[in-house]
Every structure is written in structure tokens, then in C-alpha cells.
Amino acid sequence: MSKKAPAQKKLPRAAAWYEIDMQKGVFRFKNKLCPKCGSVMAFHREPVPRWHCGKCGFTQFQR
């Protein structure tokens, strides 16, 4: 029997988190930061569009 190598985790690329402007040399964060605790907020579409902080539980609903 051959043993399988453990699966390696793929790390997210920086391009997924940042908008990069090569002409100006600027990196801008794509997601919002939580106004309460300062961590990164996630955008959820279902059941209603909203930004949610997983750390402190703050939720901001879209209009």
C-alpha cells in the first residue's frame, strides 16, 4: 500500500485581497474594515446582502 502525501493548503493570493495600481504603486484593500474592532469584514449575499464581522459580530446591511 502506498501512503498519500498530506494535502497542502493553498494560501490566498494577495491579488484576492488587494487592488494593485502598478502605475501609481498603490495597494488598496478591497474589503471593508470593521468600525467596532478593526478586523476584516466579509460580504454575504444570501439571504440579504450585508457586511459581517466574524470577530465581534457587527453586521452592516446593504440598501
Swiss-Prot record:
A zinc finger (C4-type) spans 34-56. Its cofactor is Zn(2+). Keywords: Metal-binding, Ribonucleoprotein, Ribosomal protein, Zinc, Zinc-finger. This is Small ribosomal subunit protein eS31. HAMAP family: Ribosomal_eS31. Binds 1 zinc ion per subunit. SMART domains: Ribosomal_S27 (SM01402). NCBIfam families: PRK00432.1. SUPFAM superfamilies: Zn-binding ribosomal proteins. One of its GO terms (cellular component) is ribosome. Part of the 30S ribosomal subunit. GO terms for molecular function: structural constituent of ribosome; zinc ion binding. GO terms for biological process: translation. Zn(2+) binds at C34, C37, C53, C56. InterPro entries: Ribosomal_eS31, Ribosomal_eS31_arc, Ribosomal_zn-bd. Belongs to the eukaryotic ribosomal protein eS31 family.
